[in-house]
Amino acid sequence: MGALKLYHRGLELDQNQPEAWISIGNIHYYNKDNSQALRAYEKAKDLRPDHARTYNNIGTIHKENGNYPEALSNYKVAFKYDPNYALVCRNIGDVHLKDGNNLEAIDWLHKATGLDPDNLYGWYWLGRAYYRSGKIKESVGHFLRVLSRKPDLPQVHHDLGKAYFGLRKYKEAIEHVKQAMIRNPSIPHYYITLSKIYDSLHQETRALAILDTALTWNRSDPVVWIAKGDIHKQSGRMQEALKCYDMAVSFRSDHWRGYYKKGVALYYLSRLEEAKEALEEALRMKNKDAGSNHFIGMVYLAQNDPDTAFDYLYKASILDSMNADIWFHLGQGCMRLEDWSDAEKYLQRSIELNERNKEALYAIGKVYQKMNELDRSRDHLAIFKKLSDFEKDRDALLTEIRVRPTELKLYRELAIFYEQHDYVTEAAEVLRKSVYLGDKEAKEELNRLKSLIEIDQR
């Protein structure tokens, strides 16, 4: 605290020292006293209202406090006074990244890297912005650029691994996530990412074992328990999933996602009142969550209360308007209310979002029967039957792969099956897994399918 005393003594002699107030603010900031830091920066601003660095520092305090609009406002004032200030461009990009405005983040981070090409934060954040905007190939180059300069950054290895996973380059994905874990083995989400990669390769036992390793570092981490529960849930082991979700909320009673996941598992176990209780707890913590509103609506549907169900499902559809399942259940609620016109509207929206939503196809077929539009009913029910038969055969092959995840012949059969039904993208993804497992012949087939996909996209 000696430095603070010196600055304050200097200010007793001359209050008009904005740089001194900035230095005082910096000391408080590095001592994690943001409120005192903000007061000092505000003093500096009063003394020199055109100083870009002051506004940048004020913006950083607001950013750390989660007040993104106020942070952005101050950063933009800083940029107005100094348009060559690379740090403030990075900070504006970071705020947009945190707020989900990925395209704006890309623009500002490009400015930052142009002004200060040697700063690795700008390139790393730019990679993250590209990844989050769905431009995964572009993100890889930026992460590699950072690692070429500093190869020991675990978070960059992890994010590069996630990007490779998004491109279905399994070998590279696993390698880089493992590199992250070697450099910092105590970070839970590294294990979760590696577990997801192995689970996607149908290696469920290994995926669960990786999460168990994460729990040896921190047994009370709810996110890891939820990840374990999700693996059990997708394999239909709802009781095991529920145990994991229970562990999550036992360690963190304020973890809304744990209660949401618990409510979903209880719903599938037909323990409806308990499901409602868990989902209401999740909504109490996070009222504007589409998932919790969706499933509590489904609980009310199962309890034959379509009016209440509709209210929750409608709210869910506003919160997540691109979720085909929400629109399907909203249509289902209208069917229970015998509102055939709205049922058709909502079910049609579900099918627009997911043309393979067989439940919605079946439901709208029944709605058209009620509306005496028999030709349309037959058409939709025929598509439903075709999809049902396809999924039955596909699921049989997937079950065999889960039992024998390293048998290459099964992957080849599944890829052929997908291509025969014109699902070329899915066939290519299966072959990528086969290539990772060592099937040399699959590589040639994969290249052929890639060519077909490129032709189709022109």
Name each model-derived stretch.
Residues 1-9, 30-43, 53, 64-77, ...:
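Structural signature of tandem alpha-helical TPR/SEL1-like repeats
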Residues 18-19, 52-53, 86-87, 120-121, ...:
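Helix-start (N-cap) detector for alpha-helical repeat units in TPR-like alpha-solenoids
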Residues 1-9, 23-26, 30, 60, ...:
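Alpha-helical segment of the N-proximal tetratricopeptide repeat
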Residues 378-380, 386, 393-458:
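Terminal, low-structured helical/coil segments at or just beyond the last alpha-helical repeat
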Residues 13, 47, 81, 115, ...:
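Structural marker of alpha-solenoid helical repeat scaffolds
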Residues 329-340, 346-370:
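Repeat-solenoid scaffold signature
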Residues 23, 57, 91, 125, ...:
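Canonical tetratricopeptide repeat
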